[in-house]
């Protein structure tokens, strides 16, 4: 099923526009006003699902329910926070939402250093440069970090970064395992498939540990709780930022185990060591062989939701960087056509 991210009532792109993209049958949505760590009310999830259904589509994925930093840090209050997370997962199941995409990145979610990199065709795209990141002064909070300007005050960020000084990669794995061992059984009982998103970019930033960076890490996740509900989001763009990652092989290995529950299929072009920019979706424009990736997914019997993920800003569109309508719609149609062309059932793309 081809899906499309929608940011709810605040999104300048209405559901009525999205339903006009011929291949799109599902919406990837979330509740954005629930404080991190608080349970998501069933009635709110049902209202979101009903709004999507009124527009002729299904609420296929929730992306995401954020994991509280105290859980990642392994602090004493994590038990209550994990209980709340489990209640949210139960409510997803009660509301009939089959997939939950989430991540375990400390402090920062996906990170870029440029939200409007000018490409040769005069479109703009998201980009990342590790050298540029190193020049960002966090003593002012996140004011200078693109996309994170109002996320943390200087004092709040300092305290959080200080707390992570005692958390190395293995400690973060330990805390993640504790979380999975509590949440995955609840997800399995509730009919919800957990789909962990890889770290983006797939390396440490600002001295913080990042552990979900390659195929071996994703395999390790699936062994912590050996349950079909414990799976991943296969994000081509995130994994491709590291040239050592063999995307088709990762897709085959995890797909054979039935652990790929969601796919983000976007393209990137590596522009140097630990630097990249996002590109149009077709293979020729970046470093992702999209045909090979989708072929690998199809060979394993994957029939889950796929989304075109980020897009460029084209045709003078204004909006949230990476999440305009036009280029993501082009990407959705490209992915749908590619899936059909390699022999996949169009009804499941």
Descriptions of predicted regions:
Residues 1-17, 50-53, 70-74, 79-83, ...:
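Histidine-acidic metal/acid-base catalytic patches
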Residues 20-23, 58-72:
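A short glycine/small-residue-enriched secondary-structure motif
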Residues 27:
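Long, His/Glu/Asp-enriched segments that create or flank divalent metal/ion-associated functional microenvironments
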Residues 31-46:
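Glycine-rich, proline-tolerant flexible connector loops at the mouths of alpha/beta enzymes
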Residues 32-33, 66, 106-107, 201, ...:
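Conserved beta-strand edge residues that scaffold enzyme active sites
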Residues 47-54, 62-65:
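N-terminal glycine-rich phosphate/pyrophosphate-binding loop and immediately adjacent elements
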Residues 91-95, 99-177:
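Active-site-proximal, glycine-rich beta->alpha crossover segments in alpha/beta enzymes
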């Amino acid at each position: 099923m081809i899906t499309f991210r929608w940011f709810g009532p605040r999104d300048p792109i209405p559901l009525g526009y999205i339903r006009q993209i011929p291949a799109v049958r599902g919406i990837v949505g979330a509740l954005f006003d629930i404080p991190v760590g608080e349970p998501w009310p069933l009635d709110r999830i049902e209202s979101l699902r009903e709004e999507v259904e009124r527009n002729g589509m299904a609420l296929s994925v929730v992306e995401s329910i954020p994991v509280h930093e105290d859980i990642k840090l392994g602090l004493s209050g994590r038990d209550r926070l994990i209980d709340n997370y489990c209640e949210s997962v139960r409510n997803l199941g009660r509301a009939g939402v089959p997939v939950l995409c989430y991540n375990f990145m400390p402090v920062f979610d996906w990170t870029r250093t440029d939200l409007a990199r000018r490409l040769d065709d005069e479109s703009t795209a998201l980009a990342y440069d590790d050298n540029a990141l190193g020049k960002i002064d966090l003593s002012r909070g996140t004011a200078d970090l693109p996309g994170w300007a109002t996320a943390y005050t200087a004092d709040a960020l300092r305290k959080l970064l200080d707390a992570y000084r005692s958390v190395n990669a293995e400690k973060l794995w330990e805390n993640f395992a504790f979380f999975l061992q509590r949440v995955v059984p609840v997800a399995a009982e509730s009919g919800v498939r957990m789909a962990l998103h890889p770290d983006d970019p797939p390396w440490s930033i600002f001295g913080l540990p990042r552990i979900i960076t390659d195929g071996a890490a994703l395999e390790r996740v699936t062994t912590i709780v050996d349950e079909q509900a414990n799976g991943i989001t296969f994000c081509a763009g995130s994994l491709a930022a590291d040239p050592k990652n063999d995307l088709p092989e990762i897709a085959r290995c995890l797909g054979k185990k039935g652990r790929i529950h969601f796919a983000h299929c976007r393209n990137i072009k590596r522009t140097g060591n630990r630097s990249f920019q996002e590109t149009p979706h077709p293979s020729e424009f970046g470093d992702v062989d999209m045909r090979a990736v989708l072929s690998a997914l199809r060979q394993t019997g994957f029939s889950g939701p796929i989304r075109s993920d980020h897009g460029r800003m084209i045709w003078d569109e204004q909006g949230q960087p990476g999440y305009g309508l036009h280029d993501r719609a082009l990407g959705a149609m490209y992915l749908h056509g590619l899936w059909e062309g390699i022999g996949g059932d169009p009804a499941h793309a």
